[in-house]
Amino acid sequence: MPIIRKIHARQILDSRGNPTVEVDVYTESSFGRAAVPSGASTGVHEAVELRDGDASVYLGKGVLKAVENVNTIVDEGLRGMLVTEQEEIDRMLLELDGTPNKSKLGANALLGVSLACAKAGAEYSGMSLYRYIGGTMANTLPVPMMNVINGGAHADNTVDFQEFMIMPIGFTSYSDALRCGAEIFHALKALLKSRGLSTAVGDEGGFAPNLTSNEEAIELVVEAIGKAGYKAGSPASKGGLGEGQVMIALDPASSEFYDADKKKYVFKKSDKRELSSEEMAAYWEKWSNDYPIISIEDGMAEDDWAGWKMLTDRIGSRVQLVGDDLFVTNSVRLAEGIEKKVGNSILVKVNQIGTLTETLEAIDLAKRNGYTAVISHRSGETEDSTIAQIAVATNAGQIKTGSMSRSDRMAKYNELLRIEEELGAQAVYPAAKAFRV
C-alpha cells in the first residue's frame, strides 16, 4: 500500500540566493520531492509565506520555522495516510494549519508537502505527474509567455512595467514555438548590444537595459521579432490573432506603482507621470491599438476593482486580461471577479494558495466561467519543474516561466520538450486557440 511513512523538509536556496522549502515524501514503494518558489512582487491577498524574521540569518528570510512545522506537525499528521488520496491529504493540511491564510504552518510548508505527495503518488502509480493529475485527456502543451525585457520590481533600471513577453502563436508544435522564442531572445540581445545597451538579465532571465521610456521597451521587442525573421501580429484591435507568428504579452504589475493614498498610478522609474484609474485604462487601450498585444496581466492594481472594470469594458473583448495580484489563485477572489465581470483570465501560482487541490479548483472555476488559466512560475525559482507538469495536466494552454536564460527557467521549458516527446502524436499545441478573445 502507498502509505506515507515519512515526510522530511529542509531549507535550500532559490534562484535569488534566498532560502526556500524543499520537501521529501516517502512511502514503502515510492518517493516524491518538491521545492517551493517565492515571489518578489507579491499580492497582499496571497497565502502567507512563513519566514523566520531573524535579520542576522539570511537577512531575515530563513524558512527554518516552516521546515520545522513540516518535520513535526505535518509529518505526524499525515503519516499513515494513502499518498494517492491527494484531496484528503490537502484537506488534512488545511486542518493542521487551521487559519484562512495558512499563517500558522506557512503556505510554503504546505505546498512543498502537497506537491511532493502528488509526485510520490505518481511514482507509485507508474505514471508521469501530468498523467496522474490530469488523466488520459491531458495532452495540451502550453503556449509560452517568454519574458524578454524585465523592469519594475524585477530589475534595477528605468522601466516601470515588470515584464515584456513574447508569445509564439503561429506554430503547430511546442518545440517550434520554443525555438522561435530562443531566436528572438538572441536577436534582442544582438540589438541591445548594437545600441550600446546592457544585456544583463533580471530575476527571470529577461534583459534589463536602461531605456528612455516604457514605449522603447515594447518597440525593441517588436523590432527583435522582425530581426529574428518572424512576423509580429497586428494590434488586437485590428485582428492581431488572425495574422503573424508572434504576439506580445505584458505584466506591468500595476500594484507595484499604484499609490493608494493618491489613487494614482505613478510611473516612478521613468517619467514620473501620475494617472487616474480611468487614465490608466485608456493608456492600455492605446497600447493595445498601437502594438501587437494579446495579453496584459495586472494592468490595474490588486484592489482597484473599479479600474479593472473600466479596463475590462474597454478592451476585454480583444485582449486577455490576466488577474495575478487580483485573484492570487484563490477561488473566492476569482468568484468575486467573475461576478463583477472583471478580467477574463487567471494567473495560477501554486504558492499563492498553498495546495495542489486548491490550485486545481481555481483552474476549474476559471474554465467553467469562460476564463483562461495561465500556469506561472515565481521570480524566485528552483530547478523544480512541477508547473510544467501541471500546465499539461490541466490542458491550461498557456505557461509563464521566464526567459530563454537561467537554468531555473529552462528547467520548465525542457521538461515540456520531454513531455511533448512522450506524448508523440497525441501532443497538441493550441497556438491562437489558447485564447478566448
UniProtKB/Swiss-Prot annotation:
Task: Give any Pfam family that matches.
Answer: Enolase_N
Q: Which reaction does it catalyse?
A: (2R)-2-phosphoglycerate = phosphoenolpyruvate + H2O
Q: What class of enzyme is it?
A: lyase
Entry annotation: catalytic residues = E204 (proton donor), K349 (proton acceptor)
Cellular localization per UniProt? Cytoplasm; Secreted; Cell surface
Keyword Magnesium present in the record's keywords: the answer is yes
The pathway is:
Carbohydrate degradation; glycolysis; pyruvate from D-glyceraldehyde 3-phosphate: step 4/5
Keywords of the record, alphabetical order, are:
Cytoplasm, Glycolysis, Lyase, Magnesium, Metal-binding, Secreted
What cofactor is this protein dependent on?
A: Mg(2+)
Q: Which residues bind (2R)-2-phosphoglycerate?
A: Q162, K349, R378, S379, K400
Gene Ontology terms for molecular function: magnesium ion binding; phosphopyruvate hydratase activity
Q: What HAMAP family does the annotation carry?
A: Enolase
Q: What is this protein called?
A: Enolase
